[in-house]
Structures are given as structure tokens and as C-alpha cells.
A protein has these predicted regions:
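N-terminal small-residue-enriched
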Residues: 1-452
Length: 452
């Protein structure tokens, strides 16, 4: 009996609403330092799990593949866990009607070393041998097969490749400087050759390092700031998206008090997209989440109003909503949590050059790889590339700094939104690591900036 038949036999024998899943996760890391390979490591986790639900309550059990535990046994364990929450779990009244939804891809990591070597050689050439280089190519593959007691199920595979670049040098005074950047794409490493903007990205990275050799100190204060598409996307994810996750709202996120209220200008719209944007499939396409709920777009901010939240089955029940398809689990042994998928602020109409010209004294924050926020929407981000803006022109690079603020105050302060828009892929580490993407335009706003 194949895996699907085993799953079908298990869910049909259960008296409760169930979902069973088989999952494989594979990671490979290849790192070069100044052209020499210093790491080539892979890891794999495989197993299966079962979930049983009664109303808003869930029982869960998982086991690694090497134990060869049956789905029936996992369902029994999940039912025992559910009974600790509900004395008399509801019986399933769904009729079993088979419907498969498959979205598959191949796990191909064969060319990772050759790809990262070619990228390293290109960087070394344009940097004229004057940059210390560390490049890591990271492959994230996940393959899932799942089935619900309703008969709906399928296979969903995803493969995303990340490129992490760290370049180092000495500034004019002999101090160490560096630039750290992250990019990524859907599919295997060889897809790097298909990305039109990869070489411009690499050239820009080398230029950022060169600019830092003659950088100037930041002037601390609340300033006019232009956030690039990449940095606006990071802000949207860290400071706005997390506050709109229903489990965080249940834990006290300020967004719970703002739902249905106007929080910013009508030209601001923020959506967590399930799988497509403007007719194109996204880097992290989610059609059904890890609870088997159909994924839909969530319009978090609509015309300046805090409009909707991201939910799983439990929080949807608590808030009287339909699950949005945001329940995601990193590995077979993880219970699904409310997670973002492809979160974006929609573009405006103004040219970025006109926005820069409108700033008399401020900063252009071009790139950064991480940030943190709390449930009040207060955040901190440490950029990797910042430039002065003086009299409407971009000036010198700025020494290491950080930006802080509250996302809702920042949204209120937005005075311009550019018409250019781009997507960026990354890793979200909310309890479990999952791949996400963020999309955004450039924005002009007010932010606190200070020394790092």
C-alpha cells in the first residue's frame, strides 16, 4: 500500500476531523571564503504527523520516518492529546470526497558549488581583488503530502535558494568595514543565471563597500527618511505583519484594538498574498496551509484602515472568522503557527527620483537583513547601507547606525510612496524557521536614526 492509501485508510477510520501529513525537509549550505570552500553541509528531516480537531481545539502527534509509526497510531496519540483539552471530542460529520491539489517541484542542489564559485569570481573581478569575500549559497527544500478527513489532500513541494554575501575592507582610516546582503530566488541554484537583476545587485554590493571607505557619522534624531523597496518590505514584515498575526493579537498585540479603525493615509494598502500577485505565482505560494485550510489573500490594511488579520483554525474560531490559510509548520514535528506568506505594501505613483529631490536633509536607507519588533509595533532595524540626502541629492555613505520607531506612527508619517516595487525572499524565525517573501515600494517617512 502506498503512502496515500495509508493516509486514506487512517483518516477514514477516525471518528473525528483529522489531517495526516508526510513531510521531508532538506537543507544544503555551501560557503566560500575568498574563493576557497570552507563549508559544504547538508541536513535532512523526514517524518509524519497527525492532527485531530474538535471545535477550536486540536490534538497533535508526530514521529520521525525512521520509527516507521503508522498514521493510525499517530491519530490515536493525537486523539489522546485532544482528550486532555476536550472531554468529549466532536465526531466528524464530513463526507469523504476525494480531491487532490498538487503543486510539486524537484529538489536539485547539484550545481550549488559551481554557481557560488562563478558569483564569487564575478564579485572579485569587479572589486579588483580589494574585498574580503564570504559567500553562502543555501538551499531550502520542503516536500509535503497531506490528506484531510474530508477527502481533500495533495502534494506541495517548494525549493528556494538564498545567497548571503559579506564583503569586507578597510576605510580611509584603516578601520574594518563590511557590507552584508541577502537575496534569493525560487528554484535551484542554477536559476541564478536567469535572474536579470542579479549582476546589478552584485555590482551595487561592491559599490556599497567602496562608498563606506569614505563614510560620515550619522546625525541622530527624528529625520526625513526614505526607505528603499527592500527596507520597506522588511518594515512591513517585522513591524506590521507580526502585529496582525492572530495568535499575537490573542497575546496582546496592539492591532487587536485597532481592527476596523483608520490608522494611516488612504494611499496605504498592505496585503498578505497567498500564492499570486498580479497574475504571477509568488516565491512562497501557499494554496493550502498545514491545517489543510484553503489559503486566501488577507488585506491587512485597506485604504488606510486596519482591515483584517491572519488566522489559523484556532484563532479564527476565537475571533469568529474563517481561517485565512496562514497556519504554517517548519518541520513534521512542529505544530502549525500563524505565519505570514507573501506580505506586501502596494506601490504608489511617484518616481523615486522626485521623492529624493523633495528631501532637504535626511537619509536614504538602502538595505538591511534583519529587524525586531514587539507586540506594540515598536521596532528596531540595523541597516547595512545608508546614505545622506542633502538638498535633494544623495550624498555620502553613513557609518553604522540603527533606526527605531513604532510602525503605526511611521505609517501615519508616510508622505510619499514610489511607483517602483519589488519582492524579496527571506527567513522568518518566529519560533520556527519558514521561508517568507516581502514586497514593497520606496516610502518617505519620519524615523528615529542614531549610531549603532
Amino acid at each position: 500500500m502506498n503512502n496515500y492509501e495509508n493516509m486514506k485508510s487512517a483518516v477514514r477510520s477516525s471518528r473525528h476531523r483529522t489531517i495526516v501529513k508526510k513531510q521531508e525537509d532538506y537543507r544544503r549550505y555551501v560557503t566560500l571564503k575568498n574563493g576557497r570552500k570552507v563549508l559544504d553541509h547538508d541536513s535532512e528531516e523526514a517524518g509524519k504527523n497527525a492532527g485531530v480537531s474538535s471545535g477550536i481545539y486540536k490534538g497533535f502527534a508526530g514521529a520521525p520516518a525512521y520509527l516507521d509509526i503508522s498514521y493510525n497510531e499517530l491519530l490515536k496519540r493525537a486523539e489522546e492529546n485532544l482528550s486532555a483539552l476536550v472531554s468529549e471530542p466532536e465526531e466528524n460529520n464530513e463526507s469523504f470526497c476525494e480531491e487532490r491539489v498538487d503543486h510539486t517541484c524537484e529538489n536539485d542542489t547539484t550545481e550549488m558549488e559551481s554557481v557560488v564559485k562563478k558569483i564569487d569570481e564575478y564579485i572579485d573581478k569587479i572589486a579588483k581583488g580589494e574585498a574580503e569575500r564570504e559567500l553562502s549559497l543555501i538551499s531550502f527544500y520542503t516536500g509535503k503530502e497531506w490528506l484531510k478527513s474530508s477527502g481533500k489532500g495533495g502534494e506541495e513541494d517548494s525549493l528556494v535558494t538564498f545567497l548571503m554575501i559579506t564583503l569586507g575592507a578597510k576605510d580611509k582610516d584603516g578601520n574594518s568595514i563590511d557590507v552584508e546582503r541577502l537575496t534569493g530566488w525560487r528554484g535551484p541554484a542554477v536559476n541564478a543565471y536567469k535572474i536579470k537583476n542579479l549582476k546589478p545587485f552584485l555590482r551595487q554590493t561592491v559599490q556599497m563597500l567602496s562608498d563606506k571607505k569614505d563614510s560620515v557619522p550619522v546625525v541622530p534624531g527624528n529625520k526625513d527618511i526614505i526607505l528603499s523597496c527592500r527596507m520597506t518590505g522588511l518594515l512591513v514584515h517585522e513591524a506590521i505583519g507580526h502585529t496582525a498575526e492572530a495568535d499575537n493579537i490573542y497575546s496582546g498585540s496592539v492591532a487587536g484594538k485597532l481592527l476596523g479603525k483608520k490608522i494611516c493615509g488612504e494611499d496605504i494598502n498592505i496585503t498578505d498574498f497567498a500564492n499570486h500577485y498580479n497574475g504571477k505565482e509568488l516565491v512562497v505560494p501557499i494554496y493550502y496551509d498545514d491545517e489543510g485550510n484553503e489559503a486566501r489573500d488577507v488585506e491587512i490594511v485597506k485604504a488606510g484602515v486596519f482591515n483584517d488579520i491572519m488566522t489559523d483554525s484556532y484563532t479564527a474560531g476565537r475571533f469568529g472568522r474563517t481561517p485565512s490559510g496562514n497556519a504554517r509548520a517548519a518541520c513534521y514535528h512542529d505544530q502549525p503557527l500563524v505565519r505570514m506568506r507573501n506580505t506586501a505594501m502596494l506601490p504608489g505613483t511617484k518616481e523615486i527620483d522626485r521623492i529624493v529631490e523633495s528631501v532637504e536633509d535626511g537619509y536614504f536607507i538602502v538595505d538591511g537583513v534583519s529587524g525586531q519588533s514587539d507586540l506594540s509595533g515598536t521596532f528596531i532595524m540595523v541597516p547595512s547601507a545608508v546614505y545622506e540626502i542633502k538638498n535633494g541629492k544623495i550624498g555620502k555613505a553613513v557609518e553604522p547606525c540603527r533606526i527605531t520607531g513604532n510602525c503605526f506612527d511611521v505609517l501615519k508619517s508616510v508622505s510619499d510612496i514610489s511607483n517602483r516595487f519589488d519582492w524579496y525572499v527571506g527567513i522568518c524565525a518566529k519560533e520556527q524557521e519558514v521561508v517568507v517573501s516581502s514586497g514593497a515600494p520606496d516610502i518617505r517617512c519620519r524615523l528615529n536614526i542614531g549610531k549603532a
